[in-house]
Amino acid sequence: MKKLFFLLIFFGYLSAEINWSDPNECKLPDHSIFVNKIISNMTLEQKVGQIIMPEINSITPEEAKIFSLGTILNGGGGYPNQIKNSSIQDWKNLSKSYYEASPEVNGIKIPILWGTDAVHGHNNVIGATIFPHNIALGATRNEKLIKKIGGAVAKEVSSTGIVWTFAPTIAVPQNDLWGRTYEGYSENPDLVTQLGKNFILGLQGEGEDFLAKDFVLATAKHFLGDGGTKDGIDQGDTIVDEITLKNVHGMPYYAAIDSCAITIMASFNSWNGLKAHGNEYLLTDVLKNQMEFDGLIVGDWNGHGQVDGCEDNNCPEAFNSGVDIFMVPQDWEALYWNTLDQVKEGIISVERLDDAVSRILSVKKHLGLFDGRVPHNYDQNYVGDSSHKLLARQAVRESLVLLKNENMLPMNPNKNFLIIGEQSKNIENQMGGWTITWQGKTWEGTENYK
């Protein structure tokens, strides 16, 4: 009987509800009257178009206009017209084409919002400044430097007619076997919290500069537990109790939200067997309700298709769980029609659809897209700016780590040092992933790295 009593206490503890509540300290203008007026005049077709995000090489501006699409992206290795060596003007021209294809509701243009993975510089663009990856920036422990880097990246992204980046990654890697460990600042949640917060402030600006001309929309990612998967398996299962999930992997998101991050990306991984894209408890109950996140949740690359019972072109479960935008690179048209049918059939409620569209339009309003901000009209070119290169050099210097000091430091500037090893002259591997292509590899050699 005594054993049974202790077992009941133990399992009762495991099942106890964890309180994630925390006031959102980000105080932004309330645009609900403006947004609700637009939504009240939208058709179901226009609303569904807002929640679909295709990749630029699978949709034309003309198609985007027909389907009233709200967002697009270029993935790692995605370029205008599939031309890797596209010029800055090529990027801006494509941005203009999509902008001009934006849907209108009662004479109000709802600009298409373009997102990109500018994770260590504007890394898909030839000539952009490349900064060290987060694992190196974490070694600097320099919050002011991280904030400056965020500001530099924002200017380079803006220079190509884009105003949204899917960064920073605020994962808290717990197993170095994870192939994306290099995208995290540290295994220490406190350090990840501080550096992630400052990168967001650098990207978006703050105070009167919040999302002003030289700043872009940040995305905190990936929610939640991407750095804690069993055996470090990418997109695997994070098997931890809820207290650990909150205090380790969730900690950086509190600071991100308080710093006015208004887009968060859902994660590929599962938590205790349930895919994050289909986890209503985490996305809606925890993130949107308890943590008071009032921005939008964007899915990851076909992440919804990994939810049980779903496919890339069909997943009401993810949307009902709290994902506001489907990132669906290729199968966007089939997903559009399936989702529209599901709304008409009541599988997805109109109230849930309106909530998602409201979040999307509010973000666009905060970004100034309804108030004269035209991304492709950005009139300066900061791509590869000399001051940014100096900043990148500073980041490299401050991030270097000597693993074993046998009277090596301080280094004598009058001596010569031999750098050996295959990677010493492999610029591609030194740059790492997310550089020109997703895996950081070119197919023509290293002429693109200077």
Predicted regions mapped to residue ranges:
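Sec-dependent N-terminal signal peptides
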Residues: K3-G12
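Glycoside hydrolase catalytic-domain context in secreted enzymes
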Residues: A16-K450
